[in-house]
Amino acid sequence: MNHLPEKMRPYRDLLEKSAKEYVKLNVRKGKTGRYDSKIAGDPYFPKHETYPTDENGQPMKLLAQINFSHIPQLDGYPSSGILQFYISVHDDVYGLNFDDRCEQKNFRVIYFENIVENDDELVSDFSFIGTGECDFPILSEAAVEPVKSSEWVLPTDFQFEQYTGMETMEFFGQFGEDEEDIYNELAENGFGHKIGGYASFTQHDPREYAYKEHTIMLLQIDSDDDIDSMWGDVGIANFFITPEDLRKKDFSNVLYNWDCS
């Protein structure tokens, strides 16, 4: 559970109502198997499926892969199947459309519900992606170790107001000269790589103004020297989905965002 700053302790009961489970992804550089959960590397991909391409017809690269059979179960998320996140390697903003963050032209989210277990039926050579001179935020393939945990709502997440009953800046303003320190101390809890839980941002939550139904975080990938991950100037990336779309296992309207300081 989150570390709670001393002056925030009177609000513990409010924050406890926001508790949400998530899966923390501990990462390490290294080769991964095609069925493994991973960051970067080569995907599980059946030969009979159409490989994702960007708006210019160029193959996209795997950003992350989640094998739900290999991670602790989260309420509402699939219990099996493989979920993949791809982004264009020929786009200097890593596939993000600032005007429509759900438009999957230069990023793609793919879910394989039924897994092909015959290796002969899977793509094994991904040299066609051509990443020699590419724009991609992660330089090293990484294996993940999933650990289930829980956290309270973060001040960076637009849902913070729902639990405190006050606008975020108004809430922290009551701490006077300690406002910034307390905000930063609480926000620090939310960084890192994870599935589920609440989102961290270096700028602001785009769901504060639109996409308010995208309340569930599918994935967060942070800047991380250990795996040569760098989103702009030490930024962070998130993918969100609506509860209804997640229930239907429909990943066509996923919200993608990344920002940096």
Swiss-Prot record:
It holds the Pfam family DUF1963. InterPro entries: DUF1963, YwqG-like_sf. SUPFAM superfamilies: Hypothetical protein YwqG. This is Uncharacterized protein YwqG. It comes from Bacillus subtilis (strain 168).
